[in-house]
């Protein structure tokens, strides 16, 4: 596998996989919209002991972080 290929099965073993609704709920508790101190370009969610970092380039925008600056 070269560096450009993405293997979802290997990713699932390494990362926490949560539903969009769960992400929205977690972010709604931590993000207050445009006035948030958390930059939506780097949303970090701690799930148990696994930290999942979503940075620019992701193709989803949780409703809790859908301010103008979060629409990539």
Swiss-Prot record:
UniProt crosslink position (Beta-methyllanthionine (Thr-Cys)): 55-61, 63-66, 67-70
GO molecular function, one term: signaling receptor binding
Compartments where found: Secreted
Main localization category: secreted
Modification(s) after translation: Contains LL-lanthionine and DL-beta-methyllanthionine, when coepressed in E.coli with the flavecin synthetase FlvM2.
Modified residues (2,3-didehydrobutyrine): 48-49
Keywords noted in UniProt: Antibiotic, Antimicrobial, Bacteriocin, Lantibiotic, Secreted, Thioether bond
Cross-link Lanthionine (Ser-Cys) residue location(s): 36-40
Location of 2,3-didehydroalanine (Ser) modifications: 37
GO BP annotation list: defense response to bacterium; killing of cells of another organism
GO cellular component, one term: extracellular region
Positions of the propeptide removed during maturation: 1-34
Role description: Lanthionine-containing peptide antibiotic (lantibiotic) that is probably active on Gram-positive bacteria, since its analog [Del1]Flvbeta.e shows antibacterial activity against Gram-positive bacteria. This activity is not synergistically enhanced by [Del2]Flvalpha.a, an analog of Flvalpha.a, which is encoded by the same operon than Flvbeta.e. The bactericidal activity of lantibiotics is based on depolarization of energized bacterial cytoplasmic membranes, initiated by the formation of aqueous transmembrane pores.
Name of the molecule in the record: Lantibiotic Flvbeta.e
Gene of this entry: FlvA2.e
């Amino acid at each position: 596998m070269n560096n450009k290929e993405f293997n979802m099965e290997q990713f699932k073993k390494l990362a926490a996989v949560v539903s969009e609704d769960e992400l929205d709920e977690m972010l709604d508790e931590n993000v207050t919209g445009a006035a948030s101190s958390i930059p939506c370009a780097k949303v970090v969610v701690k799930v148990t002991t696994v930290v999942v970092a979503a940075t620019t380039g992701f193709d989803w925008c949780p409703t809790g972080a859908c301010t103008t600056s979060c629409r990539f």
